Amino acid sequence: MRLRLLGDSIAAGVGSTRREDTLGPLLAARLRATGHDVDLRVHAVPGARSADLRAQVRAAVASGVDIAVVVVGANDLTRFVPAHVGAQELHDAVAKLRRAGAGVVVATAPDLSVVAHVPPALRDVVSAVSRDYAQAQLQAVIRAGGVVAHVERVVTPQFAADPALFAADRFHPSAAGYRAIAAALAPAVEAVAAEHRA
């Protein structure tokens, strides 16, 4: 099972001190536990926006891909990329991966209102903008034939309640944060892997 991770710093594992505690190895371990032989490659780049997926998709397709997990959107939000623009880039990336025969699972933009650097007075606005962005992404992914894992719905309350889920920079996940994200992503990834094997 050729598992490829694409997207931004979360997909790349920034914030964790050990590689095995990052998203790719955690998801690969879950798949191995269900009997899959997994070849993992991480094409994600810290700081990537949805527009940067083009190069990552080319790399994933060139290396061969059965399942692509895409985590993107946070940098689009922080750089004020309009939702329709980022969503179209994501749609195109998912569509290309699907045409290459891959199953695609997407974790949409996180709710950035839980980040400590966001002033309390702006949290409601940031949360609303994050939700709108994620909704645009969801529609784009479905149109392109991908699967959306509603990670933000599961982990946002966890990150809001537990500062230990953040790394020292208070922006990226810690090892514990990556475990929470992987647990939320895993059911969709495992379902797509089961379909691919069948």
Model segments located where?
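Alpha-helical cap/lid subdomain in secreted, periplasmic
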Residues: 54-198
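Conserved SGNH/GDSL esterase-like catalytic core that processes O-acyl groups on lipids
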Residues: 2-5, 10-89
